[in-house]
Regions:
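Catalytic alpha-helical scaffold of carbohydrate-active enzymes acting on polysaccharides/glycoconjugates
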Residues: 1-138
């Protein structure tokens, strides 16, 4: 019997607001909270929740089923704030024991280019959050 590994990457980029030249030095808040919330809600409603609901059912119904997730720290923060039901579904999937979680740089950035120490710190930071939220050690 052939085996496959289903790997799911969850990341959400942070949207920056329009920042005009004349705002330099006056406005130091760069994030577009409205667009960030809209984007994560849209993605959660149309992608994450339906897919994770299906994966949870598959985990419960099939003894041989396994899947793997990699979440960026940025995505975790946005999901906790704007779409906590996605975190709840991931926790339920983790509780089945049929999901592995991988570690990556917290910000889903290019930390490995800068320095090995920076890369290790980013990965350790995310690994800590995954353990805290889902009760499993990332691999």
């Amino acid at each position: 019997m052939k085996q496959i590994c289903l790997y799911f990457e969850i990341h959400q980029p942070v949207h920056l607001k329009r920042y005009r030249f004349f705002e330099i030095g006056k406005d130091h808040y760069y994030y577009d909270d409205y667009e960030n919330e809209r984007a994560i809600r849209d993605t959660a409603d149309n992608s994450y929740v339906p897919a994770l609901t299906t994966l949870l059912e598959m985990c419960k119904q099939n003894d041989n089923f396994k899947c793997c997730f990699s979440l960026s720290g940025v995505a975790i923060e946005m999901l906790e704030q704007y779409a906590p039901e996605v975190i709840d579904l991931l926790q339920q999937i983790a509780e089945t024991g049929k999901a592995d979680f991988l570690a990556e740089p917290y910000s889903h950035g290019l930390a490995s280019i800068g320095s090995e120490e920076s890369f290790k710190n980013e990965v350790a930071r995310l690994a800590g959050r995954v353990k805290e939220l889902f009760g499993v050690e990332p691999k």
